[in-house]
Amino acid sequence: MKNKNFNCITTLFMTLAIVITSCNNPSKEAQGSQTINKENMENEKLLQFGKQYAAAWCSQQPDSVAAYFSPTGSLSVNANTPAVGRQAIAKVAAGFMTAFPDIIVVMDSLITKPDATAFHWTLTGTNTGPGGTGSKVSISGVEMWQLDTAGLIQKSKGSFDADEYNRQLKVGVK
């Protein structure tokens, strides 16, 4: 009887030791899945960042857009001179927000590349700001982001079809 109890207790302790060791030293396969989950989490954070950035453009608060940039960040649109620093970026955002009081910016997609993140967007609104034409506009474009170590935009190079934009300002959306 003592021998059976000893065997049961020994087996129990060995099983417990294996379980504890396994929990403290995950297999390579489990470690790989942790890496994938971490990568997915980072992608999810970036996707959320993009959605919130688009929402900031809709807020009629230019400083909300600028807050997504590093304090020394830059924004250039269609290869024009970059706006550098949050105050200058807020001025660019204010220009669009004033021209389109009903501005809606939607994130169409966010594509992570080795050298940049591509933020694809569509802007819709009615040009009813001061000196506006009253025309409705719907234009799509992209910003190529370089992010800093804090996860803010350090550099954004934006582009959209300026000829189509100007046509829509005159006669509206097709």
Residue ranges and their predicted role:
Residues 122-152:
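Exposed beta-sheet edge and beta->alpha loop/turn motif
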Residues 53, 65-66, 73, 85, ...:
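Hydrophobic pocket/interface hotspot
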Residues 43, 62-114:
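A solvent-exposed, acidic/Ser-Thr-rich amphipathic alpha-helical stretch
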Residues 154-174:
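Low-complexity, intrinsically disordered terminal/linker segments enriched in charged
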Residues 2-10:
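Bacterial N-terminal signal peptides that target proteins for export
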Residues 23-71, 172-174:
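Short, low-complexity N-terminal intrinsically disordered segments enriched in polar/charged residues
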Residues 69, 123-125, 160:
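Short beta-strand segments enriched in hydrophobic/aromatic residues
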Residues 11-20:
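Bacterial N-terminal signal peptides
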